[in-house]
């Protein structure tokens, strides 16, 4: 049975009713549903094995974004995040996108760089040539360290050698092992290979190896998403669709040329991506580092997305960025909710997960720019933030929605106002 990711009136249900609906829709087991329904999904013994000095666990809201259709397949997207409006915006933009076939995605092979720094070299150019002449020997040695990866079709594929003739510490070489890590994020794999080949590289060059470490600029491991939106889909009561498109294009141009704006623009993209990375137990710091480094690849920090108008006057958005995520290893395997997230997504490869991530990032970027180009970011965001303010003020149950409605109606979304409203409702 194919999944329909549209969830009409889903937000009006209670959390328990939402979970029941998702459980039935996806055919989740009783144990899966219990993981989400009850606190303590991460047992203390597992948490204690993940990091050091554990004294407890920390919970964040776990939601699903609806309406996503990616390469013709409907997907419910688990998102773990504390900020209001992210899930709503992504879901609404996905609803607009699906009217034109949803998101189209693709990705390159899961190739990661392992860097080996070699210092103390008097003739870097000749040392570089010496390494390249013995490339096959180096690759063969690296691949001896992970026979399982080789059996799965992965392994070290190539080496590159970069020379830096003038550094604060004199000339140096940096060799890159190019490793196909298959469905792993790949950090441990490539680090092990880098350490394995270090003695051989020292012998070949006569230099001294210092750092042996992966690079988080995974610019060979790219994922891409594209979306097309018609003017009719973007029109509001106050703005024509054409006017909204022009506003979005101006907003994009701002991010393309101004790093101050680009930083916030790209943060909005990561608002969609990071919650999925967290939900699947992947390393969101690695994804963030790669994203912002990639945004500087031209020598100027700019927008990760591009937006343009096609010959039919439709808005076309594209996001291409590094996406080093995995399905095996680390918290992805140890955290029970990370495993459940992968089952909800229905992904079988790391590349499929990467493509969903960039689709969500593109949707989030569209939502932010649409708001900025029309009503401003605060109107919609603060309406959703009002519920959070109500909870902070002490509202419970039905009080939350009542206080939030009052805050929004009078355009006064502040904690002290929420406290006053709550006292009023309780007759205090």
From Swiss-Prot:
Active site, renumbered: 83 (charge relay system), 267 (charge relay system), 283 (charge relay system), 381 (proton donor)
One Pfam family this sequence matches: HMG-CoA_red
> Effect of altering residue 83 to Q?
Greatly reduced activity
Q: Which reaction does it catalyse?
A: (R)-mevalonate + 2 NAD(+) + CoA = (3S)-3-hydroxy-3-methylglutaryl-CoA + 2 NADH + 2 H(+)
The UniProt induction remark is:
Coinduction with mevalonate transport system.
Any one Gene Ontology MF annotation carried by this entry is: hydroxymethylglutaryl-CoA reductase (NADPH) activity
Q: Look up the EC number in the record and give it.
A: 1.1.1.88
Assembly and partners? Homotetramer.
**What is the protein named?**
3-hydroxy-3-methylglutaryl-coenzyme A reductase
Species name for this entry? Answer: Pseudomonas mevalonii
